[in-house]
């Protein structure tokens, strides 16, 4: 029911109609990848593209370049992608899901590694519209579902590789989320996951009071040992830490494409190692887990 409601709202959104008009032009487009997702059309639709893109703010993940329009997103998402890039050979000719895919930036980048099928899950109409704008020009076979991680067990298709980046700390039941990821895997499947974490050798998690780094819907920020225990309780047998990285103001910052505050406003102005609330400043751990 929720899926049908979101899909109906999406199809009735005025920007969806504008994107369909753009798509109907069937513009010739050169699609290329570097740090940005690059689209070169040399078209007469530049004004329309700019107007739609501005209406779709905030743009969180990216960047994207459409002709001479540079969508300078809040996150320099290629930094995270480059951390995972050495492991991208695992998606070649595989059925791949990106859970919490936002506007699809990571999926566009994954195309370079030739997945057999690529499906994004995110129950956000705005992010889906951002994806549709880019894909109206790029014309890729990526599929986007207005669904969440809880829909994986009943989705009807199992995946060889699942990416779940920056999601688990938004869930009030992280072990249930991990079980849902496990239920979405084929035999011998693998999950790549990242989360914010705290430095502590104990098997504990930070439970923020109201906000963490000014973000209201953060439930648990685990130690790496606690994260490992969550994964084991969910039924994963293999747990490997791939990398850790502190989030800095090069990776996440305010731009004209978000119209709101960003990391510099979320940290203690006197001590950048602390959030404005006094917690450890955000840092991320990247893991690979298998059944």
From Swiss-Prot:
One of its GO terms (molecular function) is transferase activity, transferring alkyl or aryl (other than methyl) groups. It comes from the Bacteria. The keyword Hydrolase does not apply. It holds the Pfam family Methyltransf_9. One of its GO terms (biological process) is tRNA wobble uridine modification. InterPro entries: CmoB, Mo5U34_MeTrfas-like, SAM-dependent_MTases_sf. It catalyses: carboxy-S-adenosyl-L-methionine + 5-hydroxyuridine(34) in tRNA = 5-carboxymethoxyuridine(34) in tRNA + S-adenosyl-L-homocysteine + H(+). Carboxy-S-adenosyl-L-methionine binds at residues 61, 75, 80, 100, 122-124, 149-150, 169, 284. Keywords: Transferase, tRNA processing. Its EC number is 2.5.1.-. Homotetramer. PANTHER family: TRANS-ACONITATE 2-METHYLTRANSFERASE (PTHR43861:SF1), TRANS-ACONITATE 2-METHYLTRANSFERASE-RELATED (PTHR43861). Catalyzes carboxymethyl transfer from carboxy-S-adenosyl-L-methionine (Cx-SAM) to 5-hydroxyuridine (ho5U) to form 5-carboxymethoxyuridine (cmo5U) at position 34 in tRNAs. Belongs to the class I-like SAM-binding methyltransferase superfamily. CmoB family. This is tRNA U34 carboxymethyltransferase.
């Amino acid at each position: 029911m929720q899926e049908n409601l979101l899909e109906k709202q999406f199809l009735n959104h005025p920007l969806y109609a504008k994107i369909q008009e753009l798509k109907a032009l069937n513009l010739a487009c050169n699609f290329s990848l570097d740090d940005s997702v690059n689209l070169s059309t040399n078209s007469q639709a530049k004004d329309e593209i700019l107007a739609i893109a501005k209406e779709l703010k905030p743009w969180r993940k990216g960047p994207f370049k459409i002709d001479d329009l540079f969508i300078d997103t809040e996150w320099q998402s290629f930094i995270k992608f480059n951390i995972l890039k050495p492991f991208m050979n695992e998606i070649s000719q595989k059925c791949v899901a990106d859970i919490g895919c936002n506007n699809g930036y990571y999926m566009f980048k994954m195309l370079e590694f030739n997945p057999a099928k690529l499906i994004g899950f995110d129950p956000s109409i705005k992010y889906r519209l951002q994806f549709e704008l880019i894909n109206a020009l790029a014309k890729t076979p990526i599929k986007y579902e207005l669904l969440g991680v809880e829909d994986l067990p009943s989705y009807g298709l199992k995946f060889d590789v699942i990416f779940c980046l920056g999601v688990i700390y938004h869930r009030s039941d992280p072990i249930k989320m991990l079980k849902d990821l496990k239920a979405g895997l084929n035999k011998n499947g693998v999950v790549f996951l990242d989360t914010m974490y705290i430095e502590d050798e104990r098997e504990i998690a930070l439970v923020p009071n109201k906000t963490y780094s000014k973000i209201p819907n953060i439930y648990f920020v685990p130690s790496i040992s606690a994260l490992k225990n969550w994964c084991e309780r969910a039924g994963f047998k293999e747990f490997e830490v791939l990398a850790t990285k502190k989030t800095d103001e090069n990776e996440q910052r305010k731009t004209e494409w978000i119209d709101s505050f960003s990391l510099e406003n979320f940290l203690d102005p006197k001590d950048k190692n602390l959030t404005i609330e006094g917690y450890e400043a955000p840092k991320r751990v990247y893991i690979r887990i298998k059944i």
